[in-house]
Amino acid sequence: HDVRFKSYCGPDIRAWSAPVEDLSSWRDEGPIFTYPVGGQWDVMYAPDLVEVRRKDGSKEYYLYPHSRGRNREAMVAKGSRPDGPFTPLNMTDDGMGTVPGSTMGFDPSVYIEYVTDPKDPDYGIGFRAYGFWGFQRSSAGQLDQNTMYSLRPGNQAIGYFIPASSRYGVIRDPEGTEYPSVYPGQDLGSFNFFEAASIRKVGNKF
């Protein structure tokens, strides 16, 4: 884990766990994922891990460990436990890139929205999945629940989700960029997106 101790990240992802009743008591679960190709390892940047509860009561865990491929598309791996083992879902046969349709880019984050209304068209599958990603540009899109790495059929990615900044208060996106997900009248210079998207829901706010 510390073979690149002078760098931000190493060639594996390490997990820590704690009982929800005592978030001061953390346990090191050790390395849970690494990805060697041809005897070499890629660096694991800002990962995300989400739990999906299926309608039959089973749980699946989707790990978004880092970006691969010429277009910085995100690898997605699946496991039955949060500490692994994980199996990559969207890698090409040579392991060097991602398959067509892999939509998310640098430092991805995923949010799961559960559907409980029987009248909702997604009630049968039970959830919707949303992805967020980008480096010096914020993008987002609704994911296909069957793949968890491609866009949902009929949906397009939002190319500019929130404003990105080159330095505090200075927007780096092209002049005149529209942000369909930002409320009108907001100070666009206050968002300051750079990298490592991470979305959470607290109460009724995201």
Where in the sequence are the language-model features?
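Carbohydrate-active catalytic/glycan-binding domains of CAZyme proteins
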Residues: 1-206
